[in-house]
Every structure is written in C-alpha cells, then in structure tokens.
A protein has these predicted regions:
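Conserved short "hinge" loops at termini or chain/domain junctions
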Residues: 1-49, 56-57, 61, 68, ...
Length: 93
C-alpha cells in the first residue's frame, strides 16, 4: 500500500515513508470508524479511498482542491459503507 500511495503522491524518496504510513493507518481507521470492514487483501475501491485520504492530508492543496478531494473521499467512504461485503452490521432480521 505504501508504494501505491507514494506513486499517487509522486514521491520517489523514502524520506516521508513514516508519515505516509501514518496516513495510511489513519485512513484505515477512519474507514473502520465509519463502519467499513476492510478485506485482508485490499481491493481497488479500498485502495483508492486510502490514496484519496492520503492526498488530502499530505499534499499542500488549494482550498478548491482540498474541497474537491474531500468530497471525493466522502463519496468513496459512503459507497463502501453501503456496499455489500464492506460492512459487518450483523443479522438485521
């Protein structure tokens, strides 16, 4: 996951690996708090949400870019929360 996020952020140095890993972990926690159960092997939807979260919190963005990416992340998180296989709400019957 670290390599994918670094590629998306266009980071080629290892200098920021610790910070980027913290953001990856924070993204996973944010999704978990929202009720998303991440699969053991992350799929493309989960990876993209994590990448977007990292972009929001790592890059120095303009207000417009920040708002655009935040909306994108919120939509991605919402889709995961409502999709079958990404939540564990238990038996609702």
């Amino acid at each position: 996951m670290l390599a994918l996020v670094k590629l998306a952020l266009r980071i080629t140095t290892d200098k920021y690996d610790e910070r980027i890993q913290q953001l990856i972990d924070a993204a996973k926690l944010d999704l978990k708090i929202a009720g998303v159960v991440l699969p053991a092997t992350l799929d493309e939807l989960c990876e993209q949400a994590i990448i977007t979260y990292c972009m929001i919190n790592f890059l120095g963005l303009s207000d417009d870019e920040f708002d655009r990416l935040q909306k994108s992340y919120d939509l991605q998180k919402g889709q995961l929360r409502s999709a079958t296989g990404y939540t564990d709400w238990g038996d609702q019957t």
